[in-house]
Curated annotation (Swiss-Prot):
<feature type="cross-link" description="Glycyl lysine isopeptide (Lys-Gly) (interchain with G-Cter in ubiquitin)">
    <location>
        <position position="788"/>
    </location>
</feature>
<feature type="binding site">
    <location>
        <position position="378"/>
    </location>
    <ligand>
        <name>Zn(2+)</name>
    </ligand>
</feature>
<dbReference type="GO" id="GO:0046813">
    <property type="term" value="P:receptor-mediated virion attachment to host cell"/>
</dbReference>
<feature type="short sequence motif" description="PTB">
    <location>
        <begin position="792"/>
        <end position="795"/>
    </location>
</feature>
<dbReference type="GO" id="GO:0001817">
    <property type="term" value="P:regulation of cytokine production"/>
</dbReference>
<keyword id="KW-0325">Glycoprotein</keyword>
<dbReference type="GO" id="GO:0004175">
    <property type="term" value="F:endopeptidase activity"/>
</dbReference>
<protein>
    <recommendedName>
        <fullName>Angiotensin-converting enzyme 2</fullName>
        <ecNumber>3.4.17.23</ecNumber>
        <ecNumber>3.4.17.-</ecNumber>
    </recommendedName>
</protein>
<feature type="binding site">
    <location>
        <position position="515"/>
    </location>
    <ligand>
        <name>substrate</name>
    </ligand>
</feature>
<comment type="function">
    <text>Essential counter-regulatory carboxypeptidase of the renin-angiotensin hormone system that is a critical regulator of blood volume, systemic vascular resistance, and thus cardiovascular homeostasis. Converts angiotensin I to angiotensin 1-9, a nine-amino acid peptide with anti-hypertrophic effects in cardiomyocytes, and angiotensin II to angiotensin 1-7, which then acts as a beneficial vasodilator and anti-proliferation agent, counterbalancing the actions of the vasoconstrictor angiotensin II.</text>
</comment>
<keyword id="KW-0472">Membrane</keyword>
<feature type="disulfide bond">
    <location>
        <begin position="133"/>
        <end position="141"/>
    </location>
</feature>
<feature type="region of interest" description="Disordered">
    <location>
        <begin position="772"/>
        <end position="805"/>
    </location>
</feature>
<dbReference type="InterPro" id="IPR001548">
    <property type="entry name" value="Peptidase_M2"/>
</dbReference>
<feature type="short sequence motif" description="Endocytic sorting signal">
    <location>
        <begin position="781"/>
        <end position="784"/>
    </location>
</feature>
<dbReference type="Pfam" id="PF16959">
    <property type="entry name" value="Collectrin"/>
</dbReference>
<feature type="binding site">
    <location>
        <position position="402"/>
    </location>
    <ligand>
        <name>Zn(2+)</name>
    </ligand>
</feature>
Length: 805
């Protein structure tokens, strides 16, 4: 047989083998899809029941259903390894196998997998059921929703906001801290077993595209794109920050620095994530009609059902389908109140088998009106790709899913659209001032959140990578918050806190960079859809409602799900493969120009040195080595506890003996900040159970002086080695010199004067003697002719001469 014949037979054999493997893979995937539908639905339904009714029974049911689903996935993932990806030509088959060959959490041992599930469920429960109680009335307690969120949305009382902000983190964040530490370890172990560097790298894998010529995208490229787009956004954010700071100075005049960061508890919600609720404080032209239509919604008796029906009308107007009957029957759109505990954070659910639902404790506000559009956008995406195989029913990437609803919110928020649905008066006139009002309101929500999102995810990526030691989590968190976001903690937090986990997405294991990428995508999509809708004019005035052309362009992307690379899906809509910040900057260009003019006499940017508690803080320096030499002990958390307890003791003694008040200060009331390894730190004291009541520095100084010897003795130190800066003297009694200082100074001055006089007299006498000696050889007055009446000064009458020095 000729060599060419052998080659032909070999090619046929290889092709046949590939065909056989590919056909086997298809059969395997068909079986998987059928079985997965049922098990996933049961697991999702159990999770829904728990999230809408938090009980021990529902927790157990959810865990059991989740264990079954995890065991099934682990088994199927092992079977999927039998099909080498390099031998699969069909892209749809290959993508499904790629997804299934990722083991996820099932790669962990059974014990660790169960422990991870327990941690996740416990963190979710703590977050959803956490309460903050009034210290003066322990029976009066508030959940996050609606109680604490209501305070953070509407209160203008600095101290009330601080109480809510701090209490939530103290109550919930501290409980979550040990769980979150375990979570990081287990998630990293899972990620590395799946061939990722760490869990942050695993999350970034959602954006990775391989093997598609011209459309590849790496995990590292995501980091680069996020960082360089953030640099482009910063100038706009810095001017928004400066403008908001000036307005907050008007509202809280003694609490804001004109060049400093913004206190974290004053920014509109519990986390400072969205600044939307600052609009009433910052509106540029308050005499214009209010474009926040909350009052109009209340006046017109809108309710949750009406809000979601209006959102549905919007989607239908662009040619997308109605919600299903099951959606309206099974969704939970209002807070169940005291009937049952529920997770109130808005979420969209695709349970499988065509069962789509939304969970949201809707309030009648413009903010929730726009949130309803966002959540229904998720459902539209879910319904559009429902025909895809089970493993490809997802967004092209996580940012795409978040962007879809936001596109609709951009249109729904425009004055044009609000007029069309009767929430703005028909005679509402748009002009330059209403345009700036509108754009500022949009910027408070959209631009204000971008640094928050970027910084939070950057911190988590660094934690997962091991770049931030566990004993420095909070220190680095607030350093990054100051540097990147321009936001400062209103009170210092030590390493017992876990402030990031006080946010739903962190405690519930959501990647967060999706909210950054979605913001860029949404403006790219909006620009493309507005072109399809034949919009003319500025991008911020575009309303795509009633444009079926725009709707069709969007639907063509939605129905692909994850069956095509996201870079290709993006190109199909916007004509470019990568995220681009330019459409967002174009949208806000009129506002940016206006802000630069407003800020021309203000400091733009922020100093990271200022803090709200700095004025009442005392700096401490401790020198163990110089005082104790080789016997010096190690300064650690226990020593800090002793220091704080000692100060608390001093405060109790002072208030009891000087003010006749029994106030039970505890070590938790002594707040420490800026701790340095060479043992220096700042501290201040707050009233027990009231973090907003800072004890004046002068009172703390007096308390320290009163108990100076007890504090010294506790640390085996003295006034020189345990130094309270700014308290002069620090722990010792006032130093009284034996002679008054003014008398010493007077004596020195007089001594200098006397010495000067003596020197002057001596030099004068010496000079006179020299002159007399020089004149002794001749009569200096020989030329005087007395007969002519000339006066001889050598013979003047002494009675007519004034003597002087």
């Amino acid at each position: 047989m000729s060599s060419s014949s052998w080659l032909l037979l070999s090619l046929v054999a290889v092709t046949a083998a590939q065909s056989t493997i590919e056909e086997q893979a298809k059969t395997f995937l068909d079986k998987f899809n059928h079985e997965a539908e049922d098990l996933f639905y049961q697991s999702s339904l159990a999770s829904w029941n728990y999230n809408t009714n938090i009980t021990e029974e529902n927790v157990q049911n959810m865990n059991n259903a989740g264990d079954k689903w995890s065991a099934f996935l682990k088994e199927q993932s092992t079977l999927a390894q039998m099909y080498p990806l390099q031998e699969i030509q069909n892209l749809t088959v290959k993508l499904q196998l790629q997804a299934l060959q990722q083991n996820g959490s099932s790669v962990l041992s059974e014990d660790k997998s169960k422990r991870l599930n327990t941690i996740l469920n416990t963190m979710s429960t703590i977050y959803s059921t956490g309460k903050v109680c009034n210290p003066d009335n322990p029976q009066e307690c508030l959940l996050l929703e609606p109680g604490l969120n209501e305070i953070m949305a509407n209160s203008l009382d600095y101290n009330e906001r601080l109480w809510a902000w701090e209490s939530w983190r103290s109550e919930v964040g501290k409980q979550l801290r040990p769980l979150y530490e375990e979570y990081v370890v287990l998630k990293n172990e899972m990620a590395r077993a799946n061939h990722y560097e760490d869990y942050g790298d695993y999350w970034r894998g959602d954006y990775e595209v391989n093997g598609v010529d011209g459309y590849d995208y790496s995990r590292g490229q995501l980091i680069e794109d996020v960082e360089h787009t953030f640099e482009e956004i910063k100038p706009l954010y810095e001017h928004l920050h400066a403008y908001v700071r000036a307005k907050l100075m008007n509202a809280y005049p003694s609490y804001i620095s004109p060049i400093g960061c913004l206190p974290a508890h004053l920014l509109g919600d519990m986390w400072g994530r969205f600044w939307t609720n600052l609009y009433s404080l910052t509106v540029p032209f308050g005499q214009k009609p209010n474009i926040d239509v909350t009052d109009a919604m209340v006046d017109q008796a809108w309710d949750a059902q009406r809000i979601f029906k209006e959102a549905e009308k919007f989607f239908v107007s662009v040619g997308l389908p109605n919600m299903t009957q099951g959606f309206w029957e099974n969704s939970m759109l209002t807070d169940p109140g005291n009937v049952q505990k529920a997770v109130c954070h808005p979420t969209a659910w695709d349970l499988g088998k065509g069962d789509f639902r939304i969970l949201m404790c809707t309030k009648v506000t413009m903010d929730d009106f726009l949130t309803a559009h966002h959540e229904m956008g998720h459902i539209q995406y879910d319904m559009a790709y429902a025909a895809q195989p089970f493993l490809l029913r997802n967004g092209a990437n996580e940012g795409f899913h978040e962007a879809v609803g936001e596109i609709m919110s951009l249109s729904a928020a425009t004055p044009k659209h609000l007029k069309s649905i009767g929430l703005l008066s028909p005679d509402f006139q748009e002009d330059n001032e209403t345009e700036i009002n509108f754009l500022l309101k949009q910027a408070l929500t959209i631009v204000g959140t971008l640094p928050f999102t970027y910084m939070l995810e950057k911190w988590r990526w660094m934690v997962f990578k091991g770049e931030i030691p566990k004993d420095q989590w909070m220190k680095k968190w607030w350093e990054m918050k100051r540097e990147i976001v321009g936001v400062v903690e209103p009170v210092p937090h030590d390493e017992t806190y876990c402030d990031p986990a006080s946010l739903f997405h962190v405690s519930n294991d959501y990647s967060f960079i999706r909210y950054y990428t979605r913001t860029l995508y949404q403006f790219q999509f909006q620009e493309a859809l507005c072109q399809a809708a034949k919009h003319e004019g500025p991008l911020h005035k575009c309303d795509i409602s009633n444009s079926t052309e725009a709707g069709q362009k969007l639907f063509n992307m939605l129905r692909l799900g994850k069956s095509e690379p996201w870079t290709l899906a993006l190109e199909n809509v916007v004509g470019a493969k990568n995220m681009n910040v330019r459409p967002l900057l174009n949208y806000f260009e009129p506002l940016f120009t206006w802000l630069k003019d407003q800020n021309k006499n203000s400091f733009v940017g922020w100093s990271t040195d200022w803090s709200p508690y700095a004025d009442q803080s005392i700096k401490v320096r401790i020198s163990l080595k110089s005082a104790l030499g080789d016997k010096a002990y190690e300064w650690n958390d226990n020593e800090m506890y002793l220091f704080r307890s000692s100060v608390a003791y001093a405060m109790r003694q002072y208030f009891l003996k000087v003010k006749n008040q029994m106030i039970l200060f505890g070590e938790e009331d002594v707040r420490v900040a800026n701790l340095k390894p060479r043992i220096s730190f700042n501290f201040f004291v707050t009233a027990p159970k009231n973090v907003s009541d800072i004890i004046p520095r002068t009172e703390v100084e007096k308390a320290i002086r009163m108990s100076r010897s007890r504090i010294n003795d506790a640390f085996r130190l003295n006034d020189n080695s345990l130094e309270f800066l700014g308290i002069q003297p620090t722990l010792g009694p006032p130093n009284q010199p034996p002679v008054s200082i003014w008398l010493i100074v007077f004596g020195v001055v007089m001594g200098v004067i006397v010495v000067g006089i003596v020197i002057l007299i001596f030099t004068g006498i010496r000079d006179r003697k020299k002159k007399n000696k020089a004149r002794s050889g001749e009569n200096p007055y020989a030329s005087i002719d007395i007969s002519k009446g000339e006066n001889n000064p050598g013979f003047q009458n002494t009675d007519d001469v004034q003597t002087s020095f």
